[in-house]
């Protein structure tokens, strides 16, 4: 990573940012370009740190590889629907949060038997390897749910469309993007049952506190400028999704 404020566009002056490549509306790779709310926030932060868009290098950060990518220095920061948890903070540091999601369920449009997590006993539930979503459902709401893991959310959506599973669980904003991409074949239940603070993952080292403060300042600036709200609206267009106004926009003070 280059010194902040640099304007050179040489290869040495790149900032490497981990995102998801398979989450419509959040982090999505499409014909060599990147789009989604996480991408928009990442670009805003990088610009505030002194990097141009051309100096940003996006790298795929699958859920189960996020901590290792930060620890190994493969990326400078990760914005990949990365919930801040005490367990994760043992391995990495966080800035943010830049968004508070809520865990929800997605079902086929004609599904009538599933209206919340407590209806999942005996049902097949898909989540992504390395995420905490399905464990929450099994431990708190439906002990007899059958869990199925897939490498990505797109695979979970495909399993749902083909009838292999009965529901998909993850954060509401991710599900909203997947439902929009299904063109009406899938729907989100719309009753979030957790709060998931999305953080910017950074390497745990001597400079992480100073880095977190700079990132938090950038997020705060994005919220105040109206860009944050515009990014939400742009990336959930065509769905009924509205972020929970009780928690959003959040106060970014993690890691300071």
How would you name each of these model-derived features?
Residues 11-78:
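Extracytoplasmic small-molecule ligand-binding "clamshell" domains
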Residues 56-68, 112-115, 148-158, 162, ...:
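Short helix-initiation/N-cap motifs at beta->coil->alpha
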């Amino acid at each position: 990573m280059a010194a902040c404020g640099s304007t050179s566009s040489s290869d040495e002056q790149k900032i490497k940012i981990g995102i998801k490549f398979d989450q419509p509306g959040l982090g999505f790779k499409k014909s060599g370009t990147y789009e989604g709310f996480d991408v928009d926030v990442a670009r805003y932060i990088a610009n505030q740190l002194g990097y141009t868009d051309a100096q940003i290098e996006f790298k795929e950060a699958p859920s189960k590889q996020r901590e290792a990518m930060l620890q190994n220095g493969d990326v400078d920061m990760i914005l990949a629907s990365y919930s801040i948890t005490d367990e994760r903070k043992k391995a990495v540091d966080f800035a943010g949060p830049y968004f508070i999601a809520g865990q929800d369920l997605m079902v086929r449009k004609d599904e009538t038997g599933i209206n919340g997590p407590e209806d999942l006993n005996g049902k097949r539930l898909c989540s992504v390897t390395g995420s905490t979503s399905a464990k929450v459902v099994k431990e708190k709401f439906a002990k007899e749910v059958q869990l199925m893991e897939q490498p990505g959310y797109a695979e979970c959506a495909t399993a749902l469309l083909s009838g292999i599973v009965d529901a998909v669980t993850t954060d509401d904003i991710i599900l909203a993007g997947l439902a929009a991409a299904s063109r009406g074949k899938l729907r989100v239940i719309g009753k979030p049952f957790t709060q998931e603070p999305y953080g910017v993952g950074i390497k745990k080292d001597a400079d992480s506190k100073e880095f977190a403060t700079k990132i938090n300042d950038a997020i705060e600036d994005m919220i105040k400028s109206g860009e944050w709200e515009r990014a939400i609206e742009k990336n959930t267009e065509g769905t009924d999704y509205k972020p929970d106004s009780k928690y959003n926009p959040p106060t970014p003070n993690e890691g300071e």
